[in-house]
Amino acid sequence: SGGLDTSYTVMYLAKEKGYEVYAACANTGGFSAEQLKQNEENAYKLGAKEYVTLDVTREYYDKSIRYMVYGNVLRNNCYPISVSSERIFQAMAIARYANEIGASAIAHGSTGAGNDQIRFDMTFLVMAPGVEIITLTRDGNLTRQEEVDYLNKNGYFADFTKLKYSYNVGLWGTSICGGEILDSTQGLPECAYLKHATKEGPELLKLGFEKGELKSVNGKKYEDPIEAIQVVEEIGAAYGIGRDCHVGDTIIGIKGRVGFEAAAPMLIIGAHRFLEKYTL
């Protein structure tokens, strides 16, 4: 993703282990063209031999998001499973790429705290059997500060102003981990969110659906529902819509708490649910 954990992983494997590192970013709709370009530049600075963007946004929408809209899916009536729904598509894309280049190992930046590590590991075991799985952050129980110190020591400096938070950004929302999220009595401050609430006052938003898929926003038709989702996200995020914290169970037997901002999913699912009341 180009975040702290994966940046550390690229540099450490290239510099300390002498690996030939192929950096791959599986984009599920959360990166702009500028961000992807920056990811590429950073990957080479960190020591990667090659960098590639694997765009799985279309596959993610076609095989997951549209079905979550059909089903008005909210985990515990709260969380639109923004991250967990996209991980399998990221993992499959990485596994396919690893097989394509004949990689002997696949590294990912998951910690030992939640379900993501299981999603990645199991997918790689199934789709790339025999390939070694490397998880430096998890296996070394590394702190974020330790990773920053290592990168700085080796001449790599980046904007880690939100050091205590870990983000995952996709078409169906952004997750925020760390900081206040680790304390069940606290919520996230405004500065923790990537998209800031800047608008006040009412605004009328009209969403149009065809066979369960979002096809128009405020009267403007979109052939591609992905584009329509992005428009709704921009409108809703400016009001701070879709912010919350979710507490769920993990397969490793502990509770997990995650903050999120998901304006588009909350608005789209809410509108679709009420539309069904009138039409079904």
Predicted regions and their residues:
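Beta1/beta-strand and adjacent pyrophosphate-binding region of the FAD-binding site
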Residues: 1
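Nucleotide-activated chemistry modules centered on ATP-dependent adenylation/adenylyltransferase
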Residues: 4-280
